[in-house]
Amino acid sequence: MGSEMCIRDRLNSFLKSAVSASFNRITVDGDTSTNDAVTLSATGQSGIEITAGSQHAEHYEQALTTLMIELAQDIVRDGEGASKFVEIRVTGGESEAACDQVARTVAHSPLVKTALFASDPNWGRILAAIGRAGLEDLDTDAVSIHLNGVLIAEQGARAASYTEEKGKEAMASEDLLIEIALNRGDAGAVIWTTDLSYDYVRINAEYRT
């Protein structure tokens, strides 16, 4: 990415902040590439100087982060064989790192990803992934899970209000939001990922080096 602003010392901090909120929030299958990179340059040709603490700096950082989030989500939507775009939002954690750990464990679970491909609101697989995320003293009875606004699990089991009709309706969209409330703190984290389809297996099985 490039800019004509005169930024100087703040350019690297802007980039790190925006990448943390965007490209570092995505995963398709848990693997990372050896040659992925994000670059940001500023030529200064506009003559507009971005100084620390200024309104220009705040607006620039917000715009840069918004742009990078859009680009990062486009990468997920274009994932190999992806048929669903999935946002996993974890709240109520003791720290952002703990919430991130839960979100990534769910996002990387083959059982969760294949259930999403099958449009199966399988709360058991999601809860199992949460349970193996490695959080100490996690009370699964305190965890609740919503899928596209539908409560599917609470108190360690299927929600009493849940019906198959509600689950089917929630899974109808190509964009899915999984909300996981840990109810043990005030921190949160979000990860964007995909389902795991037949085409993902085919594409990667047919690709030979």
Briefly describe each language-model feature range.
Residues 44-118:
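A glycine- and small/hydrophobic-rich beta-loop-beta segment
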Residues 19-28, 70-76, 128-131, 161-166, ...:
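Glycine-rich, charged/polar anion/phosphate-binding loops
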Residues 12-16, 39, 84-89, 141-147:
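Beta-strand segments within the central parallel beta-sheet cores of soluble alpha/beta enzyme folds
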Residues 100-101, 108, 112-209:
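Internal helix-turn-beta structural module
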Residues 11-71:
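Acidic, glycine-rich loop-and-beta core segments that form the ion-binding/anion-interacting portion
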Residues 1-7:
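Short, small-residue-biased leader/transition segments that mark boundaries at the very start
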Residues 23-35, 70-87, 113-120, 137-142, ...:
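Flexible, glycine/charged-enriched surface loops at secondary-structure junctions
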Residues 4, 32, 46, 120, ...:
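Gly/Ser/Thr-rich beta-alpha loop segments that engage phosphate groups in nucleotides
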